[in-house]
Amino acid sequence: MGYKIKSYGWQPDLPDRRDHLYAAPTPILMALPSKVDLRPQCPAVYDQGQLGSCTGNAIAGAFEFDRMKQRIGRKDYVPSRLFIYYNERVIEGTVDSDNGAQIRDGIKSIVKQGVCSEATWPYDIDQFAAKPPVAAYAEGKKNQALAYSRVARSLPQMKGCLASGFPFVFGFTVYESFESPAVAKTGTVDMPKPKEQVVGGHAVVAVGYNDATERFIIRNSWGRKWGMRGYFTLPYLYLVDTNLADDFWTIRLVEDPGQSARRAVGRGAGRKRRRV
């Protein structure tokens, strides 16, 4: 094949009626642009390697995006993906297993514990089950998400979030064609064919859309040599299909009065859940 396939790791969230839904600002919904591309504002694409830490990578990407956009903290700060991956598995009681995690739990972890820098807790996949040092948690408290909301399975809300200038994290079902040389070269992912086999679940970050092609622009965590310099596109139909994508979340580090994101201190922020 010529390209070594990385790992996946998205586990679907359990239903929770307490999830607060994102509400895109009405003025933006009334005049949605035909396309949005946040890639120029994104941090460098990560590479998760052979570890099922895609949720930690996706959440870290959204977190770093927000810090850059809102000009918070040091410019050389890169969030520790392994810190997020460990703490989301603490919530789920699976720290000793590399079986992935739920996006909601990963976001709850950066609300409660925050996230230290990768300089403090590096991305060494052999240490995935090791608890970060006390200093990492102390640093994490200085870098916490303030609010988070679930984005509805609605094209206007998804587009509205992106048009507002913020990405959203989500998970999708991966089929065989995603691992093909063609996708690795072009970054163009089509709807799965009837006889394709499911190979896993993957968490990624939506960073744009284009009405002309009816596709979302997605940030992956397989390095810059894969796809379109680390990005790929998915049809609108992929994200609105209940069998193909789920768990759409957007986070904020500074409260935005223009939309009703959930306060981090709200109910259930630390409740334990088990994976499906």
Predicted stretch roles:
Residues 1-23:
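Hydrophobic alpha-helical membrane-insertion signals
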Residues 2-8, 29-34, 40, 60-64, ...:
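Predominantly the structural core of cysteine protease catalytic domains
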Residues 17-35:
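Short N-terminal secondary-structure initiator segments
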Residues 35-50:
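Asp/Glu-centered strand-loop micro-motifs enriched in Gly/Pro and often flanked by an aromatic residue
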Residues 46-51, 94-98:
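Conserved aromatic-histidine-acidic binding/catalytic patches
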Residues 48-72, 164, 170:
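Alpha-helical support elements that line or immediately flank enzyme active sites
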Residues 50-51, 55-59, 83, 102, ...:
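Catalytic-loop motifs flanking and including active-site residues across diverse enzymes
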Residues 62-90:
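Active-site-surrounding "flap" and adjacent substrate/cofactor-binding loops of secreted or lumenal enzymes
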